[in-house]
């Protein structure tokens, strides 16, 4: 249940990269819905709002600009604005974007659907029609030409957890606050449509600053918690070589600390599912790598699948994470811990038992068992180094990632684009405090450009290292412009191998071949001498070494775009295996009727 208190949430403003060119007008905004929304965003920790202007949202944008603690980041298109809010939310805990009605709202849908799939609270605000136009049988621009213009709302109903259509100032305060608090409680996107004639009108409900939210923590059913802990402890304590595997829902459950408490107490080997990478410290002595079935990191898959009990914490088992439904795990050996439910083998399944409560309590009951860790250490062989290259040999992708491994630190974050970068980045061993993000569940190519923009805008203390394929880059390339305008200093490795490599390995065809671009020329044209941007073409290891030295030295304060030329067939062995298995799953014939 939501209550309100005067206690501030403790958030601090992030420095803004580019001050607004429009003068502040706070005196004209007192007691208005526009000011309330701006203050509410600041109060929940948002310091940057990603936007694309349109005639229905311009007055609202004036009020957001007038808030001194908010920075409006104008994006090149709505899709990237949504992806940027997604990336910002990953680093900051919540993101926000503003677009215009229907033409903007339908353009941002794909990004909001991705945020929904990844359990990210994104506040999607749309400047809507004049409140007087609803129900008048009029036809408006930016609609599909019908007097009923509810199509945008209908689309958002399936990919947001709450929808607020604000057409009346009397209930605007309640609708806005309910939407934002619901996003935070459910960790899902919400949709807020605001009539274009309403943001600047004073109303008594907005006469004072918003009272900060207090989101009461959810408390487990005590009887269910005790039963789940007792049953789980008995299940695990009789096992000979149990393991623990962290999944992506650790984030939404806010249970990373409890996960490590249990891992420390149990002594089990610690693995992560691919979409859980970055949520578990990889410098822990019991960390054994990524469990991804047939494409797991070396020896991790063998240890997990040979265990007689495995604790999956916050997993998502889909066709991608299960490598075409080919995981060699058995339900009767599994303890599945979801954010609000615990399921033990083929037996007990208890709801309203929350992940952090359960793991903390189980840590006190479980016996330490390091058998599987010792087995791992006996069979583990350190990964080899890439084969010695010939002089002036074209750069191999495994050599590129050897250098990226040396580049990352606790002061960096890795953004991995959908494609072969998924597999190469999974093999990176993340130093302590190194961020890591990718979009495993939704898998929308091009996501990483906007996500890099948003993450870098939120995490100003880290330098983002983005790994993007050429096909994905062509989908969303324009917002390199916004990165330069905001003074960001990310390092982008553009892997130019002439096509959609991940699609080639699933099902090849002429549709996977793309027009090659002069990518550094493209970025230089966008740069146009304004802001700090540096580009390089890399064809050999010598080129790469020199480029990284420049990016971390003379150009350390610039956006660095490094185009890496790779052979079209130079893919990770994991992608080859994964692609064949996913292809087999996709091509299953219909079941007999």
UniProtKB/Swiss-Prot annotation:
Region Disordered, residue ranges: 1-20
GO biological process per UniProt: aromatic amino acid family catabolic process to alcohol via Ehrlich pathway
Binding site for Mg(2+): 470, 497, 499
Keywords: Decarboxylase, Lyase, Magnesium, Metal-binding, Thiamine pyrophosphate
Pfam families documented for this protein: TPP_enzyme_C, TPP_enzyme_M, TPP_enzyme_N
Catalytic activity, EC: 4.1.1.1
Cofactor list: a metal cation; thiamine diphosphate
The protein, known as: Pyruvate decarboxylase 1
Annotated source species: Pisum sativum
């Amino acid at each position: 249940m939501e209550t309100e208190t005067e206690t501030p949430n403790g958030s601090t403003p992030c420095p803004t990269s580019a001050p607004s060119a429009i003068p502040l007008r706070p005196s004209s905004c007192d007691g208005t819905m526009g000011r309330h929304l701006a203050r509410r965003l600041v109060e929940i920790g948002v310091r940057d709002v990603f936007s694309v202007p349109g005639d229905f949202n311009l007055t609202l944008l004036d009020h957001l600009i007038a808030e001194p603690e908010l920075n409006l980041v104008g994006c090149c298109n709505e899709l990237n604005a949504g992806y940027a809010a997604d990336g910002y939310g990953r680093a900051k805990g919540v993101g926000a974007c503003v677009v215009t009605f229907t033409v903007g709202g339908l353009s941002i849908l794909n990004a909001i659907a991705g945020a929904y799939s990844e359990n990210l609270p994104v506040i999607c605000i749309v400047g809507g029609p004049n409140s007087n136009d609803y129900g008048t049988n009029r036809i408006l621009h930016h609609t599909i030409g019908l007097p009923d213009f509810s199509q945008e709302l209908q689309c958002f109903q399936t990919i947001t957890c709450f929808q607020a259509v604000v057409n009346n100032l009397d209930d605007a305060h309640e609708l806005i606050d309910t939407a934002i608090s619901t996003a935070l409680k459910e960790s899902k996107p919400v949709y807020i449509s605001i009539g274009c004639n309403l943001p600047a009108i004073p109303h008594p409900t907005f006469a004072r600053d918003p009272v900060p939210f207090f989101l009461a923590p959810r408390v487990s059913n005590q009887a269910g918690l005790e039963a789940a802990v007792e049953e789980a402890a008995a299940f695990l304590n009789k096992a000979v070589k149990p393991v623990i595997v962290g999944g992506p829902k650790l984030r939404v459950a806010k249970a990373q600390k409890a996960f490590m408490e249990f891992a420390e107490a149990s002594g089990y080997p610690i693995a992560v599912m691919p979409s859980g990478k970055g949520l578990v410290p990889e410098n822990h002595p019991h960390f054994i790598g990524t469990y991804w079935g047939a494409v797991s990191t070396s020896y991790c898959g063998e240890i997990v699948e040979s265990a007689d009990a495995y604790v999956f914490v916050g997993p998502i088992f889909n066709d991608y994470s299960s490598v075409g439904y080919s995981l060699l795990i058995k339900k009767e050996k599994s303890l599945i811990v979801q954010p609000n439910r615990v399921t033990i083998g083929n037996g007990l399944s208890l709801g309203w038992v929350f992940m952090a409560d359960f793991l903390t309590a189980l840590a006190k009951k479980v016996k330490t068992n390091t058998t599987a860790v010792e087995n791992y250490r006996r069979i583990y062989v350190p990964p080899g180094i890439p084969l010695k290259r010939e002089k002036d040999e074209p750069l191999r992708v495994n050599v590129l990632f050897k250098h990226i491994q040396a580049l990352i630190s606790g002061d960096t974050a890795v953004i991995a684009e959908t494609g072969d970068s998924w597999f190469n980045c999974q093999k990176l061993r993340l130093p302590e405090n190194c961020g890591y993000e990718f979009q495993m569940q939704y898998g929308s190519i091009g996501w990483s450009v906007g996500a890099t923009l948003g993450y870098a805008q939120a995490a100003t203390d880290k330098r983002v290292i983005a790994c993007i394929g050429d096909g994905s880059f062509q989908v969303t390339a324009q917002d390199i412009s916004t990165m330069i305008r905001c003074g960001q200093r990310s390092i982008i490795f553009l892997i130019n191998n002439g096509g959609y490599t991940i699609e080639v390995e699933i099902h090849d065809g002429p549709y996977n071949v793309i027009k090659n671009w002069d990518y550094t020329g493209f970025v230089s044209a966008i740069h146009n001498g304004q802001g700090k941007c540096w580009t390089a073409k890399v064809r050999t290891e010598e080129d790469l070494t020199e480029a990284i030295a420049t990016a971390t030295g003379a150009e350390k304060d610039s956006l660095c775009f490094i185009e890496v030329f790779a052979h079209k067939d130079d893919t990770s062995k994991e992608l080859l295996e994964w692609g064949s298995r996913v292809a087999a799953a996709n091509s299953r014939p219909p079941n007999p009727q």
